Amino acid sequence: FQTSGAIAHPEPVQAVRMALARGELLGATSDGKQIILLDPAPECPALREIGRLRELTFRRVGEGTGGRRDLDRFDGHYRHIVLWDSEALQVVGAYRLGEAGPILDRFGLAGLYSHSLFEFRPEAVEFLRDGVELGRSFVVPAYWGSRSLDYLWQGIGAYLRARPATRYLFGPVSLSADMPTAARDWLVHYHRHYYPDPDRLARARNPYRIGPDIESAAAATWQGLDARAGLAALKQQLARLNVAIPVLYRQYVDLVEPEDGGVRFLDFGVDPSFGNCVDGLIRVDLGWLKPAKRARYIDLD
């Protein structure tokens, strides 16, 4: 059982603005927001504010650390794509990313956040070195329903455009513990069934186990269905539970062609330190990126 304390007070606005001004401007949106790449720095006001807003946002969906800020040891060597509203002087959202090759050289596997939740086989290092880990994405509640998440993806696209050797995106994608158990079971079973990892490159340290009733019902449901038809069946099951597929699950899977092996879920586990959410470890092969997605986010010319 995890209790939650008070969330930290906001950082001084001008200190946050000045810290972000030292970052790399990746782009600007038509409605006046800036997309900034922030490097880690000790006691950075912008990073402290990101940690505060992460905790605030994740608690709204039944996740979070229970601490004053959601900051951990990985924030000290990861970078952050930040969406900044220069009119409201407000951090709108952020995405944490880590270039796995340099992190492995400096810290080994222990330097990757994913490794704290999943144990990688030695063979996984080959793809990890060509990858960027994504995670801890959020948009503050006041901007839900806006284009803010898409703006953050434009920032990821700008980041990848400057680093064309990047082959993979990977990282944990969460399902809230507030979601009904049956809904989580259906979601996990669908993604395991249609986007499996035949190489078994990672295993959850705290595996997620599907209940036997849904295990058999889901297996029967997908029989004879391709991924698209299976998705329609999944949506029907979730609708009965008043649940929708989480946005990031839809977004990652939709980046690539559905049956080309471009997206794999390596395993699913439970994170007791983050509200007992369920994490699916995803790997996206950018070599299978849909042309429309490449044109939208990377090849802007």
Where are these regions (language model features)?
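Conserved N-terminal entry element of GNAT/NAT acetyltransferase domains
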Residues: 2-41
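Short amphipathic alpha-helix that is part of the acyltransferase structural core
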Residues: 26-80, 84-96
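Acyl-donor binding region in acyl/amide transferases
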Residues: 55, 65-68, 100-262
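A short helix-loop-beta-strand connector motif used in the catalytic cores of GNAT acetyltransferases and
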Residues: 73-82, 260-264, 273-278
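Short catalytic/ligand-binding loop motif for oxyanion handling, primarily in non-cytosolic enzymes
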Residues: 91, 177-181, 274, 291-292
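Aromatic sugar-binding interfaces of carbohydrate-active proteins
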Residues: 247-254, 263-281
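C-terminal non-catalytic accessory extensions
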Residues: 275-301
